Amino acid sequence: MPRTPHLLAIQSHVVFGHAGNAAAVFPMQRIGINVWPLNTVQFSNHTQYGQWTGQVLPPEQIPALVDGIAGIGELGNCDAVLSGYLGSAAQGRAILDVVARIKQANPRALYLCDPVMGHPEKGCIVAPEVSDFLLEEAAAVADYLCPNQLELDSFCDRQPNSLADCVEMARSLLARGPRAILVKHLNYPGKAGDTFEMLLVAADQAWHLQRPLLAFPRQPVGVGDLASGLFLSRLLLGDDLRNAFEFAGAAVHEVLLETQACGSYELELVRAQDRIAHPRVRFDAVRL
């Protein structure tokens, strides 16, 4: 029987709704990943509601929790680390220390950094120190970097005028160290208004994926967290870059279809769980 991959997911959590680990953990489990959730913050709900309560995990607690895992002899079984929303730059540095420790225990372990700075329609949602940390430190350590358009623009200190510019910008990030760049949400002049577009760029390949853009009164939160988690999960399950990319795009679309059908603001992960595991429609990525 094939071994089930293990993934340490270090990002935010909400008690109500779906964002961060609350958006990513169940879908990753549903497709066959043993997930170890480590929550950088625990909030009552995601911040787009405009009010919330909760706490940020003290940075020193991150290595302390990993010490506990090492103490029971399981650290070498970790196949990947995923990091997302950070409450502080100190948390980020603690995560990079954890990544180094896990890679020492398992040299084949992967690190995917979802560099959460904001969303193009919402503006920057993290402290400036976190953005600086992501730009200057995390990108150099990540095997996979998964920015949205705003975050890609911040990394490259420019805005694109075309899809070709987006490819060039993503490719420039490869020089910092990542194996591949997944741009979870493209936005550039001339982009078709009725499509949602994603981009995957590695040293020897670039893939562009389009799917229908679904309309919502308020855009659901957690879509990027879901996409990053599914992409990394499919890589751990043996997919190549293109297939992991196409699977993530299709599974996220299934969740959004169910969310739209229910008239929900929060992602309908439970109702869509079978279609997350087995998307009904795949969108072919086009090689650029």
Swiss-Prot record:
Pathway(s): Cofactor metabolism; pyridoxal 5'-phosphate salvage; pyridoxal 5'-phosphate from pyridoxal: step 1/1
GO biological process: pyridoxal 5'-phosphate salvage
Residues noted as binding substrate in the record, renumbered to the chain: 12, 47-48, 225
Enzyme Commission number(s) from the entry: 2.7.1.35
Keywords: ATP-binding, Kinase, Magnesium, Nucleotide-binding, Transferase
Record's catalysed reaction(s): pyridoxal + ATP = pyridoxal 5'-phosphate + ADP + H(+)
CC cofactor: Mg(2+)
Keyword Kinase included in the entry's annotation: yes
Residues the record lists as binding ATP: 114, 151, 184, 211-214
Single GO term (MF): pyridoxal kinase activity
Function: Pyridoxal kinase involved in the salvage pathway of pyridoxal 5'-phosphate (PLP). Catalyzes the phosphorylation of pyridoxal to PLP.
Protein known as: Pyridoxal kinase PdxY
Organism from which the protein derives: Pseudomonas aeruginosa (strain UCBPP-PA14)
Encoding gene per record: pdxY
